Amino acid sequence: MKLKQGSRLLFTGDSVTDVGRNRPVAQGTLFDPLGKGYPHIVSGLINAVYPGWGIHVINSGNSGDTSRRLAARWQTDVLDFKPDWVSVMIGINDVWRQFDSPCQPEEQVGPEEYEETLGGL
């Protein structure tokens, strides 16, 4: 990944990305609303390696999201921020819904839908 001054990095996904970020969408500032997960760690590393570059890190992860829910919010929570780079970590809830919601098939995301949804993003 080649960063440039002023680059915008956006991290999105499920709870693995969210990890307590501020709402509505967390953007790295003085009070670090990025949460305590990997977006926070990456932001710290980037700012240590590229101080003064004005690299803008955004976290739009949502705990509990499936790939279907991520696709539904893709425009507002990803594209509208006009990121230069996007990191997506999604999928555990697609698997988990098979087990925690066995009587709610409308909440379940199978492998074919998962692959198609990610391909469409």
Regions flagged by a language model, labelled:
Residues 59-61:
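Residue-level recognition of beta-strand->loop/alpha-helix junctions
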Residues 16-18, 23, 64-67, 94:
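Short, flexible micro-motifs
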Residues 2-32:
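Short glycine-rich His-centered loop
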Residues 2-5, 36-56, 65-121:
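Alpha-helical cap/lid subdomain in secreted, periplasmic
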